[in-house]
Amino acid sequence: LGCETYASDYNPVATLILKCTLEYPQRYARGEELKEGPLRGDVSKNLLVQDVERWGNWVLEEARKEIGRFYPVDEDGSIPVGYIWARTIKCQNPACGAEIPLMTQFWLAKKGDKRVSLYPYVADGKVEFKIVGTGYEEMPKDFNPDKGTVHKAITRCPVCGSVIDGKSVSRLFREGKAGQRMIAVVLHNPKGKGKTYRVANEKDISVFREAERYLEEKRKKLFDEWGMDPVPDEPTPEGKG
């Protein structure tokens, strides 16, 4: 509208939104005439779009150089874009002791006609998983992905059926007796559409361990340069952290 506008905000996200709605439209609304090439003389797309695309690609390439090895491409060209983890505790039944993944539900995708979930099963006294649903093995008729191993703070062992109350679970966490487990990998195939999934394997765990080691190396290097820990360690009492 051409109005002289002033605004301020402490929140960086809100500040960016204000700049995008009040400043950038006036600054970048005009196009830029192309100086060379077959479209010489035509007006290019918005300057801001060009800048975002240019620097976005730069950030992507720099990230690939530094951490690309932690996202190894699968044989079909799919690239890992996410990992699904679960916190774990040991079954408190002395005759069992199985590792229980703490999950309130097993859905991986539940949108439109796409219904994909993890399916837990027991093999040699251990909880294993496979992918079932749209595009995968058929989902068993008697399986309900909405029901995980945890319901209303009560944990049920998939191996022996024993239950653990919420207070006992909290105590195990406080005592440092809880663990974690990588369950599945979320993948994107540049030639395909949408996300796909597979169960995590030993290679995925190995790559994660390598990333952990690299993080510690990077952390030490930055600590030496900055004189402070780059990983936030302030207590968060309201979040019980």
Spans of model-derived segments:
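Charged, often flexible domain-edge or linker segments that flank or initiate folded functional domains
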Residues: 1-241
